[in-house]
Amino acid sequence: MLNYTSFTHSRSNSIQRLFLLLSLVFVTTISSAQRAVIPLNNDWLFRFSHEVHKGSGHKVALPHTWNAVDALSGKPDYKRGIGNYSRSLFVPASWQGRRIFIRFEGANTTTDLFLNGKHIGEHRGGYGAFIFELTDKLIYGAKNQLLVRVNNAEQLDVMPLVGDFNFYGGIYRNVALLLTNDVCISPLDYASPGIYLRQTKVDAQQADVKADVMLDNPTDKTQQVEVAVEVFSGDKSIIKQQKSIRLEAQAMVKKHTIPFTIRRPHLWNGTQDPFIYKV
């Protein structure tokens, strides 16, 4: 079950907004597409790249920055360079058959991920989430070695170049493993929840909303899946909308839209009536 929030544009001549909280229950014809999120913030060993001697690193927990002290001096000479985060990761044999991702909520400024000594991928930019799929690269039933190399040195092709703030280096937000079934709501669309809400019309009479759901089918077979949306006002279910979808083989990050309408919606007013819908 996934939650995603969004809000509408303003009503004409009004600051009232409709604030929707939706959750989509996604079930394939094979098995339930539940996902597991496993925090990966602890047991990291950190060292700078110039610290090459054995035992030179020290344990840290995420979120972490190597500029926690020097960047507060008010001077522009705080450390900007490469930091390395490493840890072991035991992957149970029972995880075979699932898709496994590692998701970073943020690391500054560029990040390279290595698994068991092999380069998995790079992310450039310090202010957005990113994700890598590890499914076919893990050793199951054994310990795997993760290395995350983060660089906050100035790089002319990575924005911003200047600012009235410090470019704190490190993995400064949470990291987690994500386990899904083969057919799932895709986490690969810029590391988003894979669900986007678009309000196309909102007034006192009705709110027209479209839920765009990004779906993955990495298998070699066409899959028939069902996507369901249920909207609640308080504890009362007011909308149940579902759609049967045929996913072609090897279809990745494919958008499917489920429209629904809320009649006479309870409009959101942040200062006087902060009502929300939920699923």
Specify the residue positions occupied by each region the protein language model found.
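Secreted/periplasmic carbohydrate-active enzymes, especially glycoside hydrolases
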Residues: 1-12, 16-21, 25, 31-279
